[in-house]
């Protein structure tokens, strides 16, 4: 059955790119509502659907959605990953400005808040998007692809010249709470040279060594080092789950990303929905629903994960 959060939960922090204070609150919603964002600092046209066709194309450093009036919310990928990875199908996300707070750079604060509140089952079945045929998009060396599968798998490969990251590959079945155990604590990352360029262009003004993994060659500059030896590829998988959640329903698919980013994953969803024969909507029976992301999440997964960091 569809779910929502039992009661509101609030998060306070700063926007990664703006550096401005930001507050976000996740509210319960009724069945069939889906996920919507609402700007509380805007008087009219404040609602934005968390959907693939609301994403502004070509934005590289984050996922930014906009409504027909031009009202925007940026950096939604981590909170979307947390909602998807915890199995929340319906919620209203209120934010008091144009950017979701970055918090610690991962999705674990959002996950902790959602799991602490718990979920409420709603009187409506879950519908999923079943992939029937491969869909692939490319940009240079980057590839994003969806293949048929009876559950959501994410395969990801990255390559960076900085040896602190290097080449990393990981595959994960997203069922049975694996997002919480394996991915949600992995932080956004960047190279020091990229930080310098972003700062020169007025970006990443809220970024610090406490909310991002910054590397310079073989050196990890962030205090405490890495949470996982392959934290970078895990974070790319986290981002991918958040961006795929903008499909509007859980995906039964195998997603493969090779050096892919936010813009390419959105391009993949646009390609998918432009090919109606490549997918179908299915009403999930109990067996199918048990294979979706977020099913089986336990509160004990979070402290067990945190102790491993």
Place the predicted regions along the sequence by residue.
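C-terminal regulatory domains involved in ligand/effector binding and gene-expression control
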Residues: 1-90, 94-309
């Amino acid at each position: 059955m569809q779910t929502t959060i039992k009661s509101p939960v609030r998060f306070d922090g700063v926007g990664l790119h703006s550096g401005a204070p930001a507050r976000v609150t996740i509210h319960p919603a009724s069945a069939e509502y889906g996920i919507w964002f609402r700007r509380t600092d805007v008087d009219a046209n404040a609602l934005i659907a968390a959907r693939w066709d609301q994403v502004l194309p070509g934005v590289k450093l984050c996922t930014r959605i906009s409504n027909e009036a031009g009202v925007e919310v940026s950096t939604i990928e981590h909170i979307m990953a947390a909602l998807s990875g915890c199995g929340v199908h319906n919620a209203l996300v209120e934010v008091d400005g144009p950017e979701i707070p970055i918090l610690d750079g991962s999705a674990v604060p959002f996950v902790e808040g959602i799991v602490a509140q718990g979920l409420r089952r709603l009187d409506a079945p879950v519908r999923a998007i079943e992939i029937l045929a491969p869909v692939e998009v490319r940009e240079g060396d980057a590839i994003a692809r969806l293949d048929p599968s009876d559950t959501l798998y994410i395969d990801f490969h990255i390559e960076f010249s900085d040896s602190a990251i290097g080449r990393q590959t990981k595959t994960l079945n997203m069922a049975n709470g694996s997002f919480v155990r394996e991915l949600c604590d992995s932080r956004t990352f960047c190279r020091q040279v990229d930080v310098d360029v972003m700062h020169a262009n007025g970006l990443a003004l809220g970024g610090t060594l406490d909310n991002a993994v910054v590397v310079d060659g073989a050196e990890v500059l962030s205090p405490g080092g890495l949470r996982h030896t392959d934290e970078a590829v895990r974070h790319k998988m986290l981002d991918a789950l958040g961006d795929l959640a903008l499909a509007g329903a859980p995906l039964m698919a195998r997603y493969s990303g090779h050096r892919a980013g936010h813009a390419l994953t959105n391009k993949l969803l646009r390609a998918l929905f432009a090919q109606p024969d490549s997918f179908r909507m299915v009403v999930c029976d109990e067996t199918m629903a048990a294979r979706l992301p977020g099913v089986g999440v336990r509160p004990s997964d979070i402290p067990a994960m945190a102790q491993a960091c």
